[in-house]
Amino acid sequence: LDLLDGSNKPVVAAIHGTALGGGLETALCCHYRLAVGTAKFGLPEVHLGLLPGAGGTQRLPRAVGVEKALSMVTSGSPIGAADALASGLIDSIVEGDLRSEALAYAIEKASSSVSHPKLRDTDERLQDATDNPEIFNNVRKMIARKTRGFMAPENNIRCIEAAVSMPFDEGLKFENKLFMELMMGPQSKAQQYFFFAERQAAKVDGIGKDTQEIPINKVGVIGGGLMGGGIAMNMANVGIPVTIIETSQEALDRGLGTIRKNYENTASKGRISQEDVETRCGLIGG
């Protein structure tokens, strides 16, 4: 990555999709960044119990300012191209062909006598935090309830603090130290397991995209309590008739009454019409 921002020729990042994590860190090492209007940018490592480990915490605040950088690394949420342009993360949004415009941009910069900007040498966007160091504690207070007990958000903040208080190369060493602490610790392993397990749970092994759906014409639900009633309502909401099986007529009537009450409450809030209430209740019997 040092070869990118150390190049004496202009290095232009042409971003056409998502620049997340290492992708954004690579783009930050380039002298210029162009993107299409649908591009997304972010450093989501905090969701994996980590922090950006390739200079992201040191370059990002130099590009977008400390406050914006803190928001991005502690939330892990991506931002759009318009936001990236307004914050200084990218230099331009390309409307035409990205490749040809990026090449033209690089040729234009190569023909210029102006030196190519390196974020490692830029400190102007750090000044706000230098003048107001409380910005870091304010962020800590703001995210405290949501992130209590998690190490990654705090270490991300400490790295942004290092970007302000340390020379760039020292900040990189500090970032690497905290990154290794997180990577070798139990929290990141647990968060990474959770992250990938959650996505794997949405997939069913052996069922391909070409698998034909089986039409559902009617559903039977055993029990009309809290869970059974909720299942019945979900089916009725999409127009599928439901038969609830209960141990007694009394239990069945109670379950059907609760379902009607729930639909009536939803209608009173304007989310569905009274006609919808009757239609959906009419689909549920026992």
Each language-model region and where it sits:
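Secondary-structure transition/capping motifs at alpha-helix termini
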Residues: 5-7, 35-38, 63, 67, ...
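Amphipathic alpha-helical segments at domain termini/boundaries
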Residues: 25-29, 71-178, 195-210, 278-286
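NAD(P)+-binding Rossmann beta1-loop-alpha1 motif at the extreme N-terminus of oxidoreductases
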Residues: 202-262
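Conserved catalytic cores of soluble enzyme domains
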Residues: 1-115
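Generic, well-ordered alpha-helical scaffold segments in large soluble proteins
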Residues: 7, 63, 75, 159, ...
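Long amphipathic alpha-helix in the N-terminal Rossmann-like dinucleotide-binding domain
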Residues: 107, 178-189
